[in-house]
């Protein structure tokens, strides 16, 4: 949704005119999970005065119990009424930044951390970092108890229409709800895998775009349930089909000028664009754990399913990590194709931006573009042209993250350490599990 500017008086007026009954104060933890404190509208003045307190020790990756008091400072520009609550007492949403009791931003708040990295970008002379995401998701049927099953709601394919695309009605209702909330929807279609869908919305500045991603996920899950469906942003819920990605289309601006566009060069790209790309490539292994944060994420990053496994770039080829779409002028952008929808968008974007700024500050040279299908190249051919692999497991991604100072800087000490600790526990828990596949393979043979 486009950036808006609201005052306290605007919020009071909206709440009264729309007969809002409840306020949902939302924020995001380091795992990308939406958290909220819901209060009756009678608490509006307390909310507007930044006096809403919550227990930070109850939130994954925040603080210890002895330093748990946190305050929610609402971003008034994020005010929106959830359309589906109109019949049962309207609920309005405000996205909040998390503050400590001394009045300073909490260093463990991913949204506040992204703002910190954006300030570093501004110090280099850039004014905006824009993001256009492409989130994908699956729709599964619910059982009679309302629990998700593994039964897909259709067997459609890429760009299919009804009757093959049985998710069309659900997807249309999602789009209508998003538009009612101010989203500018650009495309909505069935994706490659059965039961898989994509809805694209217009790019926005970094913080607004990440807010939009979190709002989008909430709306998709809410409306899907009304259709007796479960929407999941799990990267690879099924074996043998494409997983769900969330490509990040990013661009830097200086005022009204796209800092990536130069009409006088062969590819229409500036030196800044090449340096930014070089920085992303250099730090790609280090930010993979952030952009692909689940054990399951690495089931998607395998050859043969249009997801990148290799660190390279191209102007047209979709097999490398980075693609530069053909649009130029103000639409010039770099597409980072590895990100999946389980990622915390604030953290993923902070990591990608810091990686790109590393390239700009150090004037890194971008390697030659790779225009052949990397999936068809063997290891010797890839090594001959300097193509590295992305990490293939959460374990190797965390190892690469520990070795990368740029990504540590991007996240700050608190988020960096808490994230690595949480994900290391997740990996240890996963590696000790015994799967159905293992029993099928080995029980009888051994």
From Swiss-Prot:
Xref: InterPro entries: Gln_synt_N, Gln_synt_N_sf, Gln_synth/guanido_kin_cat_dom, Gln_synth_cat_dom, Gln_synth_gly_rich_site, Gln_synth_I, Gln_synth_N_conserv_site
Q: How is its activity regulated?
A: Inhibited by glutamine.
PROSITE patterns listed in its UniProt record: GLNA_1 (PS00180), GLNA_ATP (PS00181), GS_BETA_GRASP (PS51986), GS_CATALYTIC (PS51987)
Any idea which positions bind L-glutamate? Answer: 242-243, 300, 306, 318, 337
Which top-level group of life is the source organism from? Bacteria
Write down the required cofactor(s): Mg(2+)
Q: What reaction gets catalysed by this protein?
A: L-glutamate + NH4(+) + ATP = L-glutamine + ADP + phosphate + H(+)
Binding-site residues for Mg(2+) 1, renumbered to this chain: 134, 247, 335
Q: What is the E.C. number? A: 6.3.1.2
Cofactor binding comment, as recorded:
Binds 2 Mg(2+) ions per subunit.
* Residues of the GS catalytic domain: 110-446
Q: Site described as Important for inhibition by glutamine, positions?
A: 64
What is its subcellular localisation? Cytoplasm
Residues bound to Mg(2+) 2 are: 136, 191, 198
Q: What residue stretches are annotated with the GS beta-grasp domain?
A: 18-103
Q: Name one GO biological process term.
A: glutamine biosynthetic process
Kind of enzyme, top EC level? ligase
Gene Ontology molecular-function annotations = ATP binding; glutamine synthetase activity; metal ion binding
Which PANTHER family does this entry report, sorted A to Z? GAMMA-GLUTAMYLPUTRESCINE SYNTHETASE, TYPE-1 GLUTAMINE SYNTHETASE 2
Task: Outline the subunit composition.
Answer: Oligomer of 12 subunits arranged in the form of two hexagons. In its feedback-inhibited form, interacts with TnrA in order to block its DNA-binding activity.
Regarding protein family, the annotation reads: Belongs to the glutamine synthetase family.
The record describes the protein's role as: Glutamine synthetase (GS) is an unusual multitasking protein that functions as an enzyme, a transcription coregulator, and a chaperone in ammonium assimilation and in the regulation of genes involved in nitrogen metabolism. It catalyzes the ATP-dependent biosynthesis of glutamine from glutamate and ammonia. Feedback-inhibited GlnA also interacts with and regulates the activity of the transcriptional regulator TnrA. During nitrogen limitation, TnrA is in its DNA-binding active state and turns on the transcription of genes required for nitrogen assimilation.
Protein name in UniProt: Glutamine synthetase
